[in-house]
């Protein structure tokens, strides 16, 4: 799950792989 790492630099949308 990238939610934890991506949400820090990118919006929640990117966390899912969009």
Swiss-Prot record:
Residues recorded as bearing Leucine amide in the entry: 18
Keyword annotations of the record: Amidation, Neuropeptide, Secreted
GO cellular component terms given for this protein: extracellular region
Keyword Secreted attached: yes
GO BP term, example: neuropeptide signaling pathway
Subcellular location: Secreted
Keyword Cell inner membrane: no
Function: May act as a neurotransmitter or neuromodulator.
Protein family per UniProt: Belongs to the allatostatin family.
Protein name: Carcinustatin-13
Native source species: Carcinus maenas
């Amino acid at each position: 799950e990238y939610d934890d790492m991506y949400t820090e630099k990118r919006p929640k949308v990117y966390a899912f792989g969009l």
